[in-house]
Amino acid sequence: MNWTMKRYDPAPFWNVPHEWPAQTAFIVAGGPSVLQQDLELLRGRNVIAINSSIYAVPWAQFLYFGDYRWWDEEANRNAIERYQGRTVTTSRLVRHPKVMICQKTNPPGLALQCDSLMQRYTSLTAATNLAAHLVGPGGTIVWLGADGKHAADGRTHHHVPHRWYSKPGCYDQQLTDLVTIVPSLKQLRISAFNASPGTAWHELLPAVDLEEMVGKQRAA
């Protein structure tokens, strides 16, 4: 099949529903610290997987990818064909009946329109924006795998590495966008936490233990 690099302009863009009102959304990003987590704790909860994290949590309700290069790999397209949840992107190069496209906005801050997601240097901002639309005021967002660094052994991801390499300074670039969403979350009255052991982004969001966080949700 010829996957032509042709921009697709959907009209209208997909509107994210307010589907998890005042609930907790867990976002599984790609950082190596995910290997230290018991992901079974998330089964049955509100979960968004970012690109290849879908292989670790195939039962997640949402899959978000922002990079066409990820979609361009046949194994990933096949995974989406098998996936039972909903797939969302901001890439206008994608045209597929199982992929919903939102409008991409630039930083600073999260996009407030429910058909838009903010992304520039990292899919984590867009996935957080997706979660914010889903949970709304009074909701909570918890990051996993938001490490902001490589592991001590040089590992870059908890899953099979992407075929493209991380550029020097990429985490600093990502941080410049991530810091701008913190005021947005406060404005939206959404609590956000980072459950990524050893994260380099410890000053961005309060650090929490995943097991304790899930325990609190069960007790609520």
Label each region the model flagged.
Residues 1-220:
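Metal-ion/cofactor- or nucleotide/acyl-coenzyme-handling active-site neighborhoods
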